[in-house]
Amino acid sequence: MYNVIFLGAPGSGKGTQGEVVAKELRLAHMATGDLFRKAIERGDELGDTVKSYMERGELVPDEITISVVLKHLAGLKDVSGIILDGFPRSLRQAEALDEALVKQGEGIGRVIYINVPEDELVRRLSGRWVCRSCQSPYQCGCAEVAEGKCSRCQGELYQRPDDTPETVKERLKVYFSKTAPLIEYYRSKGKLSEIDGMAEITEVTKRIVSAIKCGK
């Protein structure tokens, strides 16, 4: 199985790119944020715990994240590969993933780092609205946000609690202190491909696909 990690700060576009690239390359797509939001929707103890961290802009503790993700990965069947979006987010998570994959006789094929300047990240996140049904993102000022309706599935748009200006600053602070070190971790292993996230969306997709294919 060919495993690809998407790294990037909140607002870098890794979620959008993960979905598009997964479809193009026929890979499974796992977004940690989606797994957590499903837990929150269930309203169980795990969901309540996850919600409290996400609303403060903090990372969900490693032990919880590792358990949720590895359980999900173990349940995947008949897939040729997977794009991991939002995991790992710390060196401890990266080491846990490496260990789990080695036990299965697998490894990381390629790590895609989508690089976007911090001021642009703040702009994107503070103005981001998301569809409750399909999770499609929209920027403040577009027709869909004005109407409050998703153009893809007609679902209701809302602003996530973790996308408010105050929480955005905390999320980025956490990212640069805990997740950014993974860039050098994977670069040292010769697995990292850095992509300019300021390019047009279609161009970013093209560069990511090329990097993954070249890394195989």
From Swiss-Prot:
It is found in: Cytoplasm. GO terms for biological process: AMP salvage. SUPFAM superfamilies: P-loop containing nucleoside triphosphate hydrolases (SSF52540). Residues 127-163 are annotated as: LID. Keywords: ATP-binding, Cytoplasm, Kinase, Metal-binding, Nucleotide biosynthesis, Nucleotide-binding, Transferase, Zinc. Zn(2+) binds at residues 131, 134, 150, 153. Residues 31-60 are annotated as: NMP. Its EC number is 2.7.4.3. It comes from the Bacteria. Pathway: Purine metabolism; AMP biosynthesis via salvage pathway; AMP from ADP: step 1/1. The keyword DNA-binding does not apply. AMP binds at residues 32, 37, 58-60, 86-89, 93, 160, 171. Coiled coil: none annotated. It catalyses: AMP + ATP = 2 ADP. InterPro entries: Adenyl_kin_sub, Adenylat/UMP-CMP_kin, Adenylat_kinase_CS, P-loop_NTPase. CDD domains: ADK. Its main location: cytoplasm. Belongs to the adenylate kinase family. This is Adenylate kinase. It comes from Dehalococcoides mccartyi (strain ATCC BAA-2266 / KCTC 15142 / 195) (Dehalococcoides ethenogenes (strain 195)). The lineage of its organism: Bacteria, Bacillati, Chloroflexota, Dehalococcoidia, Dehalococcoidales.
